[in-house]
Amino acid sequence: AQYNTNFVLKYIICDNLNQNSVKNLVIKARENARGSQDKITKELWEHINSLYHFMNDPELPKKLETYDALSIITKLNKELLLYNGILHVTMPRGLGWCFSSIGKHIERCLQTISLTQAYYNPIGYDLDGEEDLLYWRRLLLSLSGYELYLKSYSNIPHNRKVVQQVVFNREFAHSVIYTLELIDTYLDFLFKDNNLSEARTLQNQFGRLKSYIEFTDYHYLTNKELENLLKNTKEQLTQFSTDFSKLFFSYT
């Protein structure tokens, strides 16, 4: 079934049992938006609500089995890009924006690490290997970094250069270091008037995590060190996310 196009499309887009399906993520987003309507803009709420009704159309799973599938994916892509645009243009840069940005970049960082692991694990994290650009193209496209990679790096070998872009490149918006530095900026804003010892502990915890990446020299990284770097960063960031939620959100 995992090789069946219809199955995969429905699983990713509208499977009620898949916690990370687009449908379930939109439902959760709407619940969050409804609970904080006084903190978000009318435009943002209306867009999320519209997307919610689109995803809950009972005919959607059937349409994904027809030639309408491509137009549905195109519409979803457009609507999610619009959501990003509305969020950026209309949201005041207060605490709501701060929490939203921290959550977004934690998720982005974890996605980058997971996708990177998925491509390096099958080749034993071999940084001196000679996998061709076709192998790395899918990873780079998934992270919206293929074009930047082509412009920034010369030809082979790619294995170590891809790590440089997706983990250590401060100019790449989906890199691990870029997302960690943005989280750090928002944490500074969030904690600037907070004297709670728990807040200081949390900020120090994140500072150690960021320094771990910051002071690693990818030029001399070994295969095993890369494997451990990705694994440890993922574990530490997940733990930070849990601790952050416990401090600020009582339902966690």
Q: Model-predicted segments: where are they?
A:
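Alpha-helical transmembrane segments and their helix-helix packing motifs
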Residues: 1-252
